[in-house]
């Protein structure tokens, strides 16, 4: 699939064309009442394990820019894609994430920041963009502590907002909503007792906390709540401990990784009866197919994206335009990146004559109500969270992940 724009010598995309307009920084000056050219940045890992989906997300952002018509009132808008990864590391790095956020903050024309992909990366970039009063919207960071109490670390969410003002939101449901969907899915599968392990990352720990709180409300007993170092090669001892608890199911809260695959395999070998559950982080055909067939067939995962036939018409139209423009189907996260971009552009438009004012654009974002979009109709609450609450409960077949249940979380 077509590649995105690199962080080094980052290239600028104008709204008027789906092409690189040239390399270099955004304009440094604007009229006295504010810049007439605005820059929207994205920060995504374009190399390594997340490279393919990040490239699709960048392409979705580019498509939203192309469709926006060239200008928003008297304002021109440009796009700069920043790479939060390196070819050597093969994933996002703290240094790159921080450098990207600083790049945006130093640009007086910057109006919004789309990213990061992972919650742990967003936890690094957000305090910087917040100090710069730049609206930041993540297409995929779900950690509760970014927006509300309930995370796994102290002083959250306050530590992410040194300016004292809220400047962050997301177009994907937060982990407390996802946890409710997961527990609901477990209940439909007859689960009464679940063993729960997480990785030691921000996302995994936070999701595990939410799952441990949600399960008893649905009559499901959490038998184990521990964490594991996914860098280990052998999880047989830990898996044996899980099996001794005699659960109906096993849930791993954490990012997709070779270590996560080894955990599922070890638990499945220790107890061949168990159903295996996973979050949206592992709701990926490539990850599930990396598991032995006997293990994959016991996997149950949830994802915020329903199959195309159940998506809004606007989502199906986006899919067709993406395929026609870039020569292949988009990953599910591309739809979220597209909507994040459209939401930024519409927030600039809603700010009217103050569309070049960061605070006014942020206020317009938080005023989002009953918005019809490719993701469905939603509102943004005072925390910056979306009201979207529908998930796909998927199971593995020979053809890949297929829909098993549509899960709707009560508001």
Predicted segments, located by residue:
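Bacterial N-terminal signal peptides that target proteins for export
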Residues: 1-12
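C-terminal motif of bacterial Sec signal peptides marking the signal peptidase cleavage site
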Residues: 19-22
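Beta-alpha junction/loop-to-helix N-cap segments that form part of ligand/metal-binding clefts
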Residues: 26-31, 52-56, 71-155, 228-235, ...
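Extracytoplasmic "Venus flytrap"
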Residues: 32-62, 68, 72, 82-94, ...
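Solvent-exposed loop/turn segments at secondary-structure junctions
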Residues: 46-49, 84-88, 118-123, 141-146, ...
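Extracytoplasmic ligand/sensor domains, especially the bilobed periplasmic-binding protein
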Residues: 110-225, 275-297
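Extracellular/periplasmic periplasmic-binding protein-like sensory domains
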Residues: 264-338, 351-352, 401-410
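Segments of small-molecule ligand-sensing domains
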Residues: 321-334, 345-403
